Amino acid sequence: SNSNYHFDKNTVDGEGETFRVCGTFHGDWKEELKQVIKDSKPVTWATRGKKGERKDKFIEQEEYDLTSAGASADLEVSNFNRNCEKYTKINEIAEYFKLENFQKRIHVQTTGQVWNLHIDKLYQFNPEDPSKVVRITIMLNDWEPGQFYMYGNRMYERWKAGEIHIFDWPNTPHSTANTSYVPRVSLQLTGTRTEDTDAILNERDHYYSVE
């Protein structure tokens, strides 16, 4: 990996170093959420890409890391729902950030699913200038005890539905798990930042309303 992360578990990552919260959406998308959960399908490292995509060396590396640790290469990491356009309010959130060439994906992590520690490789979203690539996560339901998100060695927790965060994807190892009995649902957007995107993400305490 080309990561510049320190990988020292005794150096505690400070607030804002590995991830940053940047605003909140307010609205009621509970009805859409029920349908999103129902429509989601489990994925592994190998099946998380689009259908027909060949397995790349990064996926082989992740599977090797899993099996070396005694886990199955077919570990269910999350459920996915790729049909964001089907849900009006959630899609409104996705379109709000004015990203270019971007992917929308809803993650529904159910009880017992674990996304093992890894570093993202998102260079393909803008090969000419990967520094313009951003991954934005919007939590779609409230945090429950037993739901884990870790960036570097700092926990991200106690979020409310609608909270937005970004992280230093080329460098920060991160992982998630759900040991609660409630599906953890988040909207993940990955693409090229525009000036509008930056303006939105720099408004840290901003509240956005979804009708």
Briefly describe each language-model feature range:
Residues S1-E100, R105-I106:
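Non-heme Fe(II)/2-oxoglutarate
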Residues K9-V12, F125-P127, N178:
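Short, flexible, solvent-exposed loop/turn segments with mixed acidic/basic and small polar residues
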Residues T18, V133, V182-R184:
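A general secondary-structure signal for short beta-strands and their flanking turns/coil
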Residues G23-G27, L140, L189-G191:
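Short beta-strand-to-loop capping motifs
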Residues N91-D168:
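Catalytic core of non-heme Fe(II) oxygenases with the double-stranded beta-helix
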Residues D142-E211:
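Catalytic core of Fe(II)/2-oxoglutarate
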